[in-house]
Amino acid sequence: MHQVMALAMVCLLVAPSILRAQNPLIEDEIEAKVEALLQKMTLEEKVGQLNQHSGSWDVTGPVPAGNEYAQRRAELLKKGGVGSMLNIVGAEATYEAQKLAVENSRLGIPLIFGYDVVHGFKTIFPIPLGESASWDLKAIESSARVAAIEATASGLTWTFAPMVDVGRDPRWGRVMEGAGEDPYLGTQIALARMKGFQGDDLTDENTMMATAKHFAGYAFSESGRDYNTVDVGTTTLYNIILPPFEATAKAGIASVMNSFNDLNGIPANGDSFLQRELLKEAWGFGGFIISDWGSIRQMINHGYSKDLKQAAYHAITSGNDMDMESQAYQNHLKELVESGEVDIRIVDEAVRRVLRMKFHLGLFDDPYKYSDTDREKALLYTDEHRAIARDVAKRSIVLLKNDRSVLPIGDDVKNIAVIGHLANDKDTPLGNWRGRGESGSAVSLLEGIQNAVGSKVKVSYAEGYTMSTDDGVFNRALHFPEDDGSGFAEAIKIAKKADVVILTVGEKALQTGEGRSKVDISLTGRQLDLFNEIRKVNDNVVVVLMAGRPIVEPELYEQSTTLLNTFHLGTEAGNAIADVLFGKYNPSGKLTMSIPRAIGQIPVYYNHKSAGRPSPGPGDEGSVFWSHFNDEENTPQYPFGYGISYTTFEYSAPELSGSTMGMNETVEVSVDVTNTGDFDGEEVVQFYIRDRFASTMRPVQELKG
């Protein structure tokens, strides 16, 4: 199909802000209500608003006798000693907890209910790293909107997402939660996800508070080891790490979560520069800051605070408003104020921020507005939501190789061999941080292929290899067999007879995520061995790589002829991949995180600066005295922005609306894109700039549109 599209891009120096859609009269009214309520509150009640507790107890009935933990939480709720709960989910459960707080406490201040709604609630979407590969901001916003609709129908009012950490190190397991290595694209995606969660009006029962996390530098943990120290210079801090936080703060995000790590020697939740000077004062952030789970207490482990009392002091005075599960404020903040160590005005300001968001949510008008069981039954896991999940999933798939034009699979193919543990895995596609997605509820790749071909094509399956010896749990390590080849014979047998082989390799869901850092990010077990055996007996092998991070496996990339990178795609994974395999959808995804050739290259990213000796000059070939590895190329296996299609596109020369651009000005770039191939397709048009001579060094490339 030959079609010309005229595209215009605006090159921006800063990310566009989402309009807050806030009426000044309403804002003034809310501020007046906050002040009036604050004047009525005792010190104990003020401190209570700054505590968040986990609801690891059943509140749908009487608090069980003998459960001391539950009894303490119930008593705190009745006294107004809790401002927010997390991990209480469901319209009925949140109603009961809200009732304890509102109908028993002196002032009846309602609770906010928080939860990690990261990439879907009941209907699960692609992991954020995968979703970012769509480069489709409308699709990403729709993903967050569906998640908000489902989560709020289950009583939740607050999500601890989006994670906006810019990540360069795939050894760090939490890259699966982010949008990759680029601050510009990461900022646009952060704003889209924030808009999807919060909408334009937080009083709308289909919207919820969003959280920009982790502030700041968490993804730069040394060696990719989770919770490790972070030491970065101001150039990296201001140009790479902070832009998504600044943009979301200025756009009106409801909350910011600080990070577990220290930043240049100061724990982030005790850093006044980050939280007070930068976020609240310079950027005008109007929401509140919450710590991560138990992280105020962890300032003791950092060697920054001598005990929990001092940790509470460091946190509140540096601008950390709410304490998540450290009990530092609960146990020590009242004492710190009464002793004069902490000014009551600091506490009042933190409480104002929390109350302000409760008024914005409309909780004082109706504290039970999110606890509607009929709405919950009607809005979870609907056909419409699954259709949206399938659409977003197919847009997130990246075609890395199609050398033999095996894809899309044509009608002449009558025998397909589907091989690999992951092909018949209904849990792994959900990824880590899967909200309330039910284990084993995803459409597997095998099911997706069977749904696509019906009885017209013979589909055979062999596991080939065993991925793990357990199903895994969120907070426990997985165990992998090293030498299980017992399934090879059956896999080879069906591969020999097939017209096309679909071979899955990659990672289980819980191999990435929090606490899942790895020094070896190659394929586990004998997956690569099976790939080599299968390609000996069939030339038409389509490799489907399912993983939560870039996988370092050069032999796989170099020896395969057809390769799809599908990440963990969520509820509709199998159907979405089948849409691409059989040409119902032409893949348009592009990588947002470079795939290294070797682990020793890490970090490898596209927007690096030029070295003083970047490459050998004329006559210097063979010289070692330039910035390179003696045993590997500098470039990644696949770079940021890479992804091919079933068709081809031709670009005209770009035209600029002007030859210069001043501070805070824009230049429009126009280009004609022609589809010169045989398939309909969509193209992600990327625009990069380079400032060749500047007062401070700039990257060799910077994405700007």
Model-identified regions with their sequence ranges:
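Bacterial Sec-dependent N-terminal signal peptides
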Residues: 1-23
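Glycoside hydrolase catalytic-domain context in secreted enzymes
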Residues: 21-705
